[in-house]
Amino acid sequence: MDKSLFEQARPILEQIQDNGFEAYYVGGSVRDYVMGRNIHDIDITTSATPDEIESIFSHTIPVGKEHGTINVVFNDENYEVTTFRAEEDYVDHRRPSGVTFVRDLYEDLQRRDFTMNAIAMDTAYKLYDYFDGQQDINNRIIRTVGIAEERFQEDALRMIRCLRFQSQLSFDIATETFEAMRIQMADIKFLSIERIVIELTKLMRGINVEKSFNHLKSLKAFNYMPYFEHLDMNQINVTEAIDLELLIAIVSVKFDINYSLKPLKLSNRQVKDINQYIQIMNALPSIITKEQLKMFVYDYDTHLIKNVMVAADVIKANDIQGHEPLIVNLQTIDETLHRLPMHNRKDMMVNGGVLMAHLNAKSGPWLKDVLRQIEIAIVTGKVSNEETEILKWVDNHVKI
């Protein structure tokens, strides 16, 4: 089992301990270590206060000092070091009104979300598991620490995180935990959509996404999310992992809607990908010739095309017409891409200025149309991408 990331962080824990404080690895890294999974981010919990951590280390960043978190920069890596804390009453089902720093590990671990995430580990790899997290991991169960209703009242996002973990880890959800989610799911309406989108993005890529997505539907979670709240998501089927952006595109195509994506507060890149996914799915069924395939591969992002094709079963499960596999498949996509004479308009050996000069014409709507005609002619092999040949072709085929 790879312990390298823990060993890289070990000097931080040892330095804290040398100054008379406790320090432990905690959270997802310990959970993944227990499960034998790859370790990613290392989080550290300590009895030292933020001020004490800043006095111990020369290079720190007070990223969340008021909540007890200091980033310690060590060997060009950032490590989150958080003081043992007890949280006061939560407001709006999403954040504590305040935190109290404590000196007791148990008190810190009991505030955490799920038993599998409430295990601490010292530098000797001894585990501190007060809530039977290892047993739940062995039984592949997600269970809240303490009373489920209280954990979800504190932070409603934990319900979406629970489903995300179920998707990623292929665990079951403890009965009392699931029943609390059924009762309290409406509280996710108090959350920022940005936090929900982060969890949904991870959930949709999980190995057990079908079960988790069905739980999202049965728990009526979509009823309390912007954008999705206006749709009958019970009609949407997800049978395997796909990008969240592709899910949104499938929803749009299936329901033939053009709702604004602004309520989801996505990045410009995400919105662009969603729009391309929609265009790709709408274009695929009509591709029956090699010329159409060439223009299709030229016009759209190949990575997104492949994502749609790999998700063919999901698309079919939502009664959306797919592609003709003899014409469009992963092999023909790659071969067509490799053989394209150019990959975007910047590669074209003429531009608007050259055309206007050659035709002695002023700019106007005609210019965009002619440039597109030239693109099609080059990509489909009707003319070579050379200025003289293109201008000859324009003289013979274009009227303005």
Swiss-Prot record:
Molecular function via GO: ATP binding; CCA tRNA nucleotidyltransferase activity; magnesium ion binding; tRNA binding
InterPro entries: Bact_CCA-adding_enz_type3_sf, CCA-adding_enz_C, CCA-adding_enz_firmicutes, NT_sf, PolA_pol_head_dom, PolyA_RNA-bd
Keywords: ATP-binding, Magnesium, Metal-binding, Nucleotide-binding, Nucleotidyltransferase, RNA repair, RNA-binding, Transferase, tRNA processing
One GO biological process term: RNA repair
Pfam family for this entry, one: tRNA_NucTran2_2
Cofactor needs: Mg(2+)
Annotated binding of CTP, by residue: G28, R31, R112, D155, R158, R161, R164
Binding site for Mg(2+): D41, D43
Keyword Nucleotidyltransferase part of the UniProt annotation: yes
Recorded superkingdom: Bacteria
Keyword check for Heme: no
Catalysis performed (reactions): a tRNA precursor + 2 CTP + ATP = a tRNA with a 3' CCA end + 3 diphosphate; a tRNA with a 3' CCA end + 2 CTP + ATP = a tRNA with a 3' CCACCA end + 3 diphosphate
EC numbers on record: 2.7.7.72
Residues that bind ATP: G28, R31, R112, D155, R158, R161, R164
SUPFAM superfamilies from the UniProt entry: Nucleotidyltransferase, Poly A polymerase C-terminal region-like
Family matches, as NCBIfam families: PRK13299.1
Subunit annotation: Homodimer.
Family: Belongs to the tRNA nucleotidyltransferase/poly(A) polymerase family. Bacterial CCA-adding enzyme type 3 subfamily.
Other observations noted: A single active site specifically recognizes both ATP and CTP and is responsible for their addition.
Stated role: Catalyzes the addition and repair of the essential 3'-terminal CCA sequence in tRNAs without using a nucleic acid template. Adds these three nucleotides in the order of C, C, and A to the tRNA nucleotide-73, using CTP and ATP as substrates and producing inorganic pyrophosphate. tRNA 3'-terminal CCA addition is required both for tRNA processing and repair. Also involved in tRNA surveillance by mediating tandem CCA addition to generate a CCACCA at the 3' terminus of unstable tRNAs. While stable tRNAs receive only 3'-terminal CCA, unstable tRNAs are marked with CCACCA and rapidly degraded.
Designated name of the protein: CCA-adding enzyme
Organism: Staphylococcus aureus (strain MSSA476)
Gene that specifies this protein: cca
